[in-house]
Amino acid sequence: MARVPERVIAIEKIADETNIKSLLEKPVHVLSGGERQRVLLARSLIGNPELLVLDEPAQNLDISGQLAFYKLLEQIYQSRSLSILMVSHDLHMVMATTKKVVCLFHHICCSGEPQIVTKDPEFVSLFGNDMAEMMAVYQHGHNHTHEVHDHD
């Protein structure tokens, strides 16, 4: 019996983790936006990174696709204990799905947990009181502490 190479086993594990097993034989050009994002995410996990850098990862996804993608990111974050740096202009999703926010406007205006950032005077001056008040703020769904690593 032939031994299955470790690389094949690793790829199958990632395909299961990102729910792309049924997509492996399909050409990329026929995939939906959400399917394509999951394939790209799976590809980025192959090297077992400690950090994922995502630039507008939910762009061009409908709202249900965005929610599914962010849930998948949360699962990967939890299971792999990796860090995720995400660039996004979608303030509602950022505030609802992240644990730490860095707000940039020519410089770092403010940073911290979403509920702190939305009250920061620089955030309020950029987006106004109404925007700050209507931001959906992330509600952490389980009870434990996270180790935070700040690198200056």
What are these regions (language model features)?
Residues 27-31, 35:
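Conserved ABC ATPase signature
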